[in-house]
A protein has these predicted regions:
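Catalytic-loop of the protein kinase fold
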Residues: 155-176
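C-lobe/activation-segment region of protein kinase-like
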Residues: 182-265, 282
């Protein structure tokens, strides 16, 4: 990671715009390498209101310095520019100074695709459902929960370094089916331990927000879908509301609360509501136990063969042209699932 001159790059397209950053694809003119450029949203820059985003950018750079070598889940940051005018590259007339981050292109596909693709009837929730909620391809051991395990391990390292990484929803996680590896593409939402900030609803954002995200996005209390349509829609993407309301909604949607795995989930929810997790490892233990019970329930379901047939049919949707816009070769990535 080093300071970069953008004269070595040429923009090739717009990938999207988030709450703080505009994201574009670019190519290195000397090597042909495809990269991703992130800068503050242009409208915010032109109003000279981008100082908070610049502070967030500095925090991201510092995080990479401290943690990148000890993790294998962060999208590599090639470098960053000095805080200056970048009109020569962007050619948009913006003369204010700002920093641009230059990332490697994340491998794999997002667990949930771009919401705008829904207009084109793209089943953007397919990866999340196939690989995190209903991983019916590998039920013999806990490796089927590789996404959850990687997120827990990443957060543990952040927490030990005095940071809490949030906004870990499936749209910010790329996944490689062939290896089970994840890549986190957004480190913008961090809270320092001991310096937790009050959120929009009056409660300080802390490690419990991470616990909520894990249960909200990466667990589900339902049997596997009985049709392909059940795999198409993303799960849990409604914005997080207040803690109590969020937890009550999760309990309300638990199907068959008398089932052992669902009892464990309700127990976790109640512990979060009552702030009973006094150590991060205790949440890890409870979640691991819960996922183990879910795996056994899937594995021992008498209708498993039927559910798996639907799962494999749904997997074929990832061979559509839409997913080729990512760093993803379907024939290679999905070959291990061939019957």
């Amino acid at each position: 990671m080093h300071e970069i001159q953008l004269k070595n790059y040429e923009i090739t397209g717009i990938l999207g715009t988030g709450a703080d950053y505009e994201v574009r694809s670019a190519v290195a003119l000397d090597t042909g390498e495809t990269v991703v450029l992130k800068r503050p949203i242009p409208q915010v820059i032109t109003r000279d209101m981008h100082a908070p985003i610049e502070a967030r950018t500095e925090s991201i750079i510092e995080t990479y310095r401290d943690l990148f070598e000890s993790t294998n889940t962060l999208c590599p940051l090639i470098g960053y520019t000095s805080k200056c005018n970048h009109n020569e590259l962007y050619n948009d007339g913006i003369m204010q100074n700002y920093t641009v981050l230059v990332f490697e292109r994340a491998p794999g596909i997002p667990l949930v695709g771009d919401a705008r693709s829904r207009i084109l009837r793209i089943p953007i929730g397919i990866p999340q459902n196939l690989f995190t909620l209903y991983p019916l391809f590998q039920l013999d051991d806990s490796s089927c929960w590789s996404v959850q395990a990687a997120l827990l391990e990443t957060e543990r390292k952040f927490f030990e370094s005095g940071r809490i990484l949030l906004d870990l929803g499936p749209q910010n996680i790329h996944y490689q089916p062939a290896t089970g590896q994840i890549t986190i593409i957004d480190l913008g939402d961090q809270v320092m331990v001991g310096d937790e900030k009050v959120g929009n609803r009056g409660r300080k954002r802390d490690i419990y927000d991470f616990y909520i995200e894990i249960l909200k996005y990466y667990t589900i209390s339902a049997d596997p879908p009985k049709s392909i349509d059940g795999y198409k829609e993303p799960h849990g993407l409604r914005p997080v509301i207040g803690l109590d309301q969020e937890m009550n909604e999760m309990i309300r949607t638990v199907e068959s609360p008398e089932v052992s795995c669902n009892k464990l989930k309700i127990n976790m929810i109640n512990k979060i509501k009552d702030f009973e997790y006094d150590d991060f490892s205790h949440f890890m233990v409870d979640l691991t136990e819960y996922l183990q019970e879910v795996r056994i329930r899937y594995r021992d379901n008498p209708e498993l063969a039927s559910y798996q047939a639907i799962w494999f049919e749904s997997l074929q949707l990832l061979k559509a042209d839409h997913w080729r816009k990512y760093d993803f070769e379907a024939e290679t990535e999905l070959s291990k699932f061939d019957k």
